[in-house]
């Protein structure tokens, strides 16, 4: 049996930055550091930070007045920001800059009173934060998840209408939704290209390349990770069975029956240490060769907030 590793895989620049912000805040200010929502959607990462003194909460009312709080990579609504200010919380913002870019598009639409349509998954924290940038009662923001949702939209005129997307969606599904939007509202405005981020795009392309060559694709990522779920869906859609798992303990030997080539990739919030532990487990189960696909090189880097950078330099 052979493993082929996808490339690129695992951590993206936004996840790297978010984790660094929590680590540096702990190093400089000491525990506890409060984090609103899991800083990234990965159980291994979150548990590691929790052991070092990070306290993960879902709402700010769980954070004592004046404490340090970090906003997760998924971003937060304006209401959450205002509450943090009112409560005199010291905030470090780990929102991915590519999510912030979408927030700015929504805020611009809100200021102009332009109606906005967000393509995204209902209930996902990124979607909640992005929807929460719109506060103009004269306009409105509407969420669609799929082509079927567009039929339910009853907006009167499309001359003052714009769309944006969650950053971690399926490229293929999103293209279909955008096409349907443009058919229904020919004058709708939107970003020059969709808002799906470079890391999501690159990892989906890598899975395409992988699925063509493999009998099974293993995606390392947590069940609540949007981008990891999309990777597993993509492989399945291409006709290659895919399994989404948290770590090596989840590998089921039964999956490997009649399998010669196993593809392994990781979502943008899954660290390489988990990939290597899965590779080790698969070697125990009979894998004797490991190859790596050549893929596009990623050199994106996002700085941490200045206050954490100054201390880092010392």
UniProtKB/Swiss-Prot annotation:
Its EC number is 1.17.7.4. It catalyses: isopentenyl diphosphate + 2 oxidized [2Fe-2S]-[ferredoxin] + H2O = (2E)-4-hydroxy-3-methylbut-2-enyl diphosphate + 2 reduced [2Fe-2S]-[ferredoxin] + 2 H(+); dimethylallyl diphosphate + 2 oxidized [2Fe-2S]-[ferredoxin] + H2O = (2E)-4-hydroxy-3-methylbut-2-enyl diphosphate + 2 reduced [2Fe-2S]-[ferredoxin] + 2 H(+). The active site is at residue 126. GO terms for molecular function: 4 iron, 4 sulfur cluster binding; 4-hydroxy-3-methylbut-2-enyl diphosphate reductase activity; metal ion binding. It comes from the Bacteria. InterPro entries: LytB/IspH. (2E)-4-hydroxy-3-methylbut-2-enyl diphosphate binds at residues 41, 74, 124, 167, 225-227, 269. Binds 1 [4Fe-4S] cluster per subunit. GO terms for biological process: dimethylallyl diphosphate biosynthetic process; isopentenyl diphosphate biosynthetic process, methylerythritol 4-phosphate pathway; terpenoid biosynthetic process. Keywords: 4Fe-4S, Iron, Iron-sulfur, Isoprene biosynthesis, Metal-binding, Oxidoreductase. Pathway: Isoprenoid biosynthesis; dimethylallyl diphosphate biosynthesis; dimethylallyl diphosphate from (2E)-4-hydroxy-3-methylbutenyl diphosphate: step 1/1; Isoprenoid biosynthesis; isopentenyl diphosphate biosynthesis via DXP pathway; isopentenyl diphosphate from 1-deoxy-D-xylulose 5-phosphate: step 6/6. [4Fe-4S] cluster binds at residues 12, 96, 197. Its cofactor is [4Fe-4S] cluster. Isopentenyl diphosphate binds at residues 41, 74, 124, 225-227, 269. NCBIfam families: ispH_lytB, PRK01045.1-2, PRK01045.1-4. Belongs to the IspH family. PANTHER family: 4-HYDROXY-3-METHYLBUT-2-ENYL DIPHOSPHATE REDUCTASE (PTHR30426:SF0). Catalyzes the conversion of 1-hydroxy-2-methyl-2-(E)-butenyl 4-diphosphate (HMBPP) into a mixture of isopentenyl diphosphate (IPP) and dimethylallyl diphosphate (DMAPP). Acts in the terminal step of the DOXP/MEP pathway for isoprenoid precursor biosynthesis. This is 4-hydroxy-3-methylbut-2-enyl diphosphate reductase. It comes from Actinobacillus succinogenes (strain ATCC 55618 / DSM 22257 / CCUG 43843 / 130Z). The gene is ispH.
């Amino acid at each position: 049996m052979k493993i082929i590793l996808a490339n690129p895989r695992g951590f993206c620049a936004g996840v790297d930055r978010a984790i660094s912000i929590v680590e540096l805040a702990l190093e400089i200010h000491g525990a506890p550091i409060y984090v609103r929502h899991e800083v990234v959607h990965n159980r291994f990462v979150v548990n590691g930070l929790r052991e070092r003194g990070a306290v993960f909460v879902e709402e700010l009312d769980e954070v004592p007045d004046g404490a340090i709080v970090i906003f997760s990579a998924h971003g937060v609504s304006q209401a959450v920001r205002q509450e943090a200010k009112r409560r005199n919380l010291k905030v470090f913002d780990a929102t991915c800059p590519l999510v912030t870019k979408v927030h700015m598009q929504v805020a611009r639409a809100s200021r102009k009173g332009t109606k906005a349509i967000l393509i995204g998954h209902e209930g996902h924290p990124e979607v909640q934060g992005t929807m929460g940038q719109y506060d103009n009662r004269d306009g409105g923001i509407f969420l669609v998840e799929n082509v079927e949702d567009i039929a339910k939209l009853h907006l009167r005129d499309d001359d003052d209408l714009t769309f944006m997307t969650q950053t971690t969606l399926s490229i293929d599904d999103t293209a279909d939704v955008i096409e349907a939007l443009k058919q229904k509202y020919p004058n709708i405005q939107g970003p020059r290209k969709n808002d799906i981020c470079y890391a999501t795009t690159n990892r989906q392309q890598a899975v395409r390349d992988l699925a063509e060559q493999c009998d099974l694709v293993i995606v390392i990522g947590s069940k609540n990770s949007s981008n990891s779920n999309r990777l597993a869906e993509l492989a399945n859609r291409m006709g290659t069975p895919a399994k989404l798992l948290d770590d090596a303990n989840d590998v089921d030997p039964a999956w490997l029956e009649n399998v010669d080539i196993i593809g392994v990739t990781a979502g943008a919030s899954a660290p390489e240490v988990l990939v290597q532990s899965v590779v080790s487990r698969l070697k125990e189960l009979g894998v004797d060769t490991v190859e790596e696909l050549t893929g596009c090189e990623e050199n994106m880097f996002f700085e941490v907030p200045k206050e954490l950078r100054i201390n880092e330099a010392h």
